[in-house]
């Protein structure tokens, strides 16, 4: 993985405590604390979540202060650690998607994040429900009109510097800036003000995966205490704010949140990633022939990268006389000269890069130079919703849909959405989720304490009973299965 953010930060000797030992509550204590947290979340009227690097480590992004964190290894002279996949392909974790569900149900009012990995926005959390205190490695902002641009590639700079792109607003056109802070940069006032306001309103601030060391952000959760609110902390290391918290849990964040969601009978939605390409075909007449140019580019501009594409195969299934080709260099472009009077079908196969949930997806493109295609713009949100429903129903990626097309004489351009990944978190074999059997007694029924804690109706627990029955048939004790 490219950890560009850590590499681009200016050098600083004092980064606080690093390499702190990890603490794990015993299974019994962890179970008890998860039950307590589930009650706190269920009873909360204004829940605010404060997140740090620890919620993203299960996606392959190293943290900063843990035993193998970025700053821990740098201090020992080992440099920036590697990771398991490209930064731009990092997938929201179980915790990210659980927060999306909590927001949809109305329980979660706001998220305050110190992370720059864009996983909260990538997960589907509404922008208006999120404050990114340290910026976003995939976001640019116009300093003039304040319009934000969320990209599918990592921005080249940090430190609120100019980027190569300009605002697309015809009445503006100002040079864009990155949004990621360097050490000496002040926190963005808009994000800070929103975060402070939400913490003051909160009756519960849940801190997830953060050491609560970076000021002034680390003091925000405590603002809830002034109005009678409470603070709960889930982290593998001790934090300076533990003594002020009503509940401190030492455990893996995904495991804790999976348990909370299960106890509240809430489903963790799948993560479905959709990427976009722009396809254009321009032509010029040369006697009885047509010279045409095909381009596959980013919707963010002709020079912007397409990080999710490794190559594009162009073939002509109905025309054996037309030679297929594999485009390997970005920007993807192909020039050909063909007869004006012979229409053909172009098959574009997009070969995806590492980290995608499938290897490729194909789009048919009918070409007839004697006919001008019509222009249209479809309802983007509706199309994406239908596309994601189809991906979830089929449990696989690769689906695609056209969002808009512009047809003019001698040219046509269209934008397509492609599902490039789908990850489920609610299956029994999910490594991060807590098996349902963990919360059952040896006879397969839910513990009375669990039902009392969440107001669960035993008649609605058919799935839990089926799981327990399967375990008994296999000769396993549901109460002793490994988490």
Curated annotation (Swiss-Prot):
- What terms describe the molecular function in GO for this protein? chromatin DNA binding; histone deacetylase activity, NAD-dependent; metal ion binding; NAD+ binding; transcription corepressor activity
Please provide the record's keywords in A-Z order: Metal-binding, NAD, Nucleus, Transferase, Zinc
The residues listed in the UniProt record as binding Zn(2+), with positions renumbered to this chain, are 142, 145, 167, 172
Task: Cite the Deacetylase sirtuin-type domain residue spans from the record.
Answer: 27-267
Disrupted gene: phenotype observed: Enhances histone H3K9 acetylation on transposable elements and promoters of hypersensitive response (HR)-related genes. This leads to increased HR-related gene expression, hydrogen peroxide production, DNA fragmentation, and programmed cell death.
Domain of life of the native organism:
Eukaryota
Which GO biological process annotations does it have? ethylene-activated signaling pathway; negative regulation of transcription by RNA polymerase II
**UniProt main location, coarse:** nucleus
Task: Name the Enzyme Commission number(s) assigned to this protein.
Answer: 2.3.1.286
Where does the chain bind NAD(+)? Answer: 53-57, 63-65, 114-117, 209-211, 235-237
Reaction(s) the record says it catalyses:
N(6)-acetyl-L-lysyl-[protein] + NAD(+) + H2O = 2''-O-acetyl-ADP-D-ribose + nicotinamide + L-lysyl-[protein]
Q: Where in the cell is it found?
A: Nucleus
Q: Which residues form the active site?
A: 134 (proton acceptor)
- What are the disulphide bonds in this sequence? none
Instruction: Please provide, in alphabetical order, the Gene Ontology terms of the cellular component aspect for this entry.
Output: nucleus
Cofactor binding comment, as recorded: Binds 1 zinc ion per subunit.
Look up the record and name the cofactor or cofactors this protein needs: Zn(2+)
- Relate the induction remark in this record: Down-regulated during senescence.
Q: Which PANTHER family match?
A: NAD-DEPENDENT PROTEIN DEACYLASE SIRTUIN-5, MITOCHONDRIAL-RELATED, NAD-DEPENDENT PROTEIN DEACYLASE SIRTUIN-6
Similarity comment text for this entry = Belongs to the sirtuin family. Class IV subfamily.
Q: What is the documented function of this protein?
A: NAD-dependent protein deacetylase. Has deacetylase activity towards histone H3K9Ac. May have a function in the safeguard against genome instability and DNA damage to ensure plant cell growth. May act as a repressor of leaf senescence by histone H3K9Ac deacetylation. May negatively regulate metabolic signal transduction involving methanol and jasmonates during leaf senescence. Required for histone H3K9Ac deacetylation and repression of AP2-1/RSR1 and amylase genes during early seed development.
Q: List other remarks.
A: Plants silencing SRT1 undergo early senescence at 3 month-old when grown in greenhouse. Silencing SRT1 gene leads to seed abortion.
This protein is called what?
A: NAD-dependent protein deacetylase SRT1
The gene designation is SRT1
């Amino acid at each position: 993985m490219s950890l560009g953010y850590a590499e681009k930060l200016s050098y600083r000797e004092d980064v606080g405590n690093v390499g702190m030992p990890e603490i794990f509550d015993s299974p019994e204590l962890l179970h008890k604390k998860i039950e307590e947290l589930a009650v706190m979340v269920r009873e909360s009227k204004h829940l605010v979540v404060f997140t740090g690097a620890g919620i993203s480590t299960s996606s392959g992004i190293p943290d900063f202060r843990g035993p193998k964190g970025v700053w821990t290894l740098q201090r020992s002279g080992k440099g920036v650690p590697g990771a398991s996949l490209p930064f731009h392909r990092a997938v929201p974790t179980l915790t990210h998607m659980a927060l999306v569900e909590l927001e949809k149900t109305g329980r979660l009012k706001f998220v305050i994040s110190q992370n720059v990995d864009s996983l909260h926005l990538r997960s589907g959390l509404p922008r208006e429900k999120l404050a990114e205190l340290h910026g976003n490695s995939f976001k640019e902002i116009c300093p003039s009109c304040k319009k934000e641009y969320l990209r599918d590639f990592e921005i080249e700079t940090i430190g609120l510097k100019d980027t190569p792109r300009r605002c697309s607003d015809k009445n503006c056109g100002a040079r864009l800036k990155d949004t990621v802070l360097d050490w000496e940069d002040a926190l963005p006032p808009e994000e800070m003000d929103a975060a402070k306001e939400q913490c003051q309103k909160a009756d519960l601030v849940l801190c997830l995966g953060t050491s609560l060391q970076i000021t002034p952000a680390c003091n925000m959760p405590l603002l809830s205490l002034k109005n009678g609110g409470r603070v709960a902390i889930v982290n593998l290391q001790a934090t300076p704010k533990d003594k002020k918290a009503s509940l401190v849990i030492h455990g893996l964040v995904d495991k804790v949140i999976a348990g909370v969601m299960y106890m509240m009978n809430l489903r963790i939605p799948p993560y479905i990633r959709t990427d976009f390409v722009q396809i254009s075909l321009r032509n010029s007449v040369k006697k009885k022939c047509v010279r045409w140019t095909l381009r596959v580019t980013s919707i963010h501009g002709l020079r912007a990268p397409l990080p999710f594409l490794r190559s594009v195969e162009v073939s002509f299934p109905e025309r054996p006389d037309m030679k297929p080709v594999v485009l390997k260099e970005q920007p993807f472009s192909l020039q050909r000269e063909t007869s004006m009077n012979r229409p053909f079908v172009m098959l574009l196969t997009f070969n995806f890069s590492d980290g995608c949930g499938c290897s490729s997806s194909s789009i048919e493109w009918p070409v007839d130079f004697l006919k001008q295609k019509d222009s249209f713009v479809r309802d983007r949100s509706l199309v994406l919703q239908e596309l994601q429903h189809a991906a979830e129903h089929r449990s696989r990626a690769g689906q695609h849909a056209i969002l808009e097309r512009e047809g003019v004489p001698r040219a046509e351009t269209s934008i397509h959405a492609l599902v490039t990944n789908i990850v489920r978190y609610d299956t029994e074999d999910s490594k991060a989720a807590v098996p349902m059997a963990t919360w059952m007694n040896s006879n397969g029924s839910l513990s009375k304490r669990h039902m009392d804690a969440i107001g669960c109706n035993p008649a609605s627990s058919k799935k839990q009973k089926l799981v327990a029955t399967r375990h008994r048939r296999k000769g396993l004790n549901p109460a002793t299965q490994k988490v």
